[in-house]
Amino acid sequence: DIEEIKLTNVGYSFKDKEIFKNINCSFEKGKNYAIVGESGSGKSTLINIILGNNKQYSGSVKYNDVEISDIEESQLFKSVSYIGNITHIYHDSLRNNLTLWDNKINESEIINILKQVNLIDLIPRLDDEVSMSFLSEGQKQRLGIARAYLTKTNVIIMDESMANLDRDNAFLIENQLLNDPTRMYITVSHHLQEKLLDRFHSIITL
């Protein structure tokens, strides 16, 4: 499990323009974090640095005291679930879209997760093939969140992942994530729901 992700003096510039500098923070297992800021402030860039996708930064990023550059990408992929605002849908069954062909995930787990993300209507259609018109944008986004739950990683990073959800579904899902003591939860958002603000251990403003 990832117990801590630590950023020390992290900075990033693009075409000689400084986007941010001297970011110092720690993300710990069982705690909730939000990264906020105006468009262009570098929120998604910071997430890509944390995920190991962007290597053009200054400073240090460590997972459990190991520099991210020393960690195999495949290991990072197994340790962290990332959910963006677009969920990739495979031309396969709904079940395989949720489990990513992991046969160790059983039916009851899938049903439980679909209930958590308010996709109960899809339970009878688990073995139906998914087409582009099969799901609404909001359903696709909730499918992506369900997929992340099912991977059982203890780090969940969401980048504007609630953008296509109505307020009630967004609240339902975020409330569950904020209540989960087994995971480190990091969200990037333009708009945090006010009634959930006190549930974040730290809010990082860029």
Predicted regions and their residues:
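ABC-fold ATPase nucleotide-binding domain signature/coupling loops
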Residues: 119-143, 147, 152-154
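The feature captures the beta-strand-to-loop junction immediately N-terminal to the Walker
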Residues: 36-38
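Helix-to-loop junction immediately C-terminal to a conserved catalytic motif
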Residues: 51
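Catalytic Walker B motif of ABC-type/P-loop ATPase nucleotide-binding domains
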Residues: 156-160
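Conserved "ABC signature" C-loop
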Residues: 87-131
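Conserved ABC transporter NBD signature motif
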Residues: 59-67, 76
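Conserved structural motif at the start of ABC-family nucleotide-binding domains
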Residues: 5, 20-22
